[in-house]
Amino acid sequence: MAELKIPAGTNARHDLLALGALVTRLDPGIVPFSAADHYDLHVSGGEYNVAANLALCFGMKTAIASAIVDYPIGQRVRSAVRAAGVEAYYVQYKHDGVRGPNMGQVWSDRGQGLRAPVVFYNRANEAAALLGPGSFDWKAIFGGGVRWFHSGGIFAALSETTPELIVEAMRAARAAGAVVSFDLNYRAKLWSAAGPDGPGRAAAVLGRIAEQADVILGNEEDLQMGLGLAGPAIGGKSKLDPA
């Protein structure tokens, strides 16, 4: 197995650069959605969370490349990213006051006791889904020095163009000497929303992206559904089964 060489961080502008969607997550706590009157708002994103936690927990120099919308929700997202200490490279979109483009929205009821957690989305006309090849000046971004580049399967599932952008960014990262990682993060709801062939297309799309990565992250479901690898039935064992 080849040794993974992480570039020295002395002169690098970013220890990690993430590419993905920024979303607002509405959380009613332990109250079911149908009974909740209030929700806590969190700024999140499968790829962004890596950058935010490295910055907040370890003081690392991180950044996010994403889409932002010029309306109050977008301003709230900007503030949260800034407060986390994450630098941002934004493609800016203007909201038309009615239809968008919008910042994606995730609803997450954490469940309680025997009631399982529930997650669903409102990602209609999402700004991040409009991103594609050419959206970012990778030469300028990586020119400042980036040690590690990261993206994920949630962003890849948003549109036909986001996987192409991920591949473009990975190639630029590799050319700049950065380590490249990809979190498969298979989400059946997102791929199914792409149409009846969505789940089948996931393996082809994620497989092509995975070929560009030095590090692949995922669990059994990600590997089977996201890459089409053979394995035991995903639902065949309890989540608590140590085997």
Language-model segments: residues:
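Conserved N-terminal subdomain of the carbohydrate kinase-like
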Residues: 61-153
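Conserved phosphate/ATP/ADP-binding segment of small-molecule kinases
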Residues: 189-243
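Hydrophobic faces of well-ordered beta-strands that scaffold small-molecule active sites
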Residues: 64, 180-182, 216
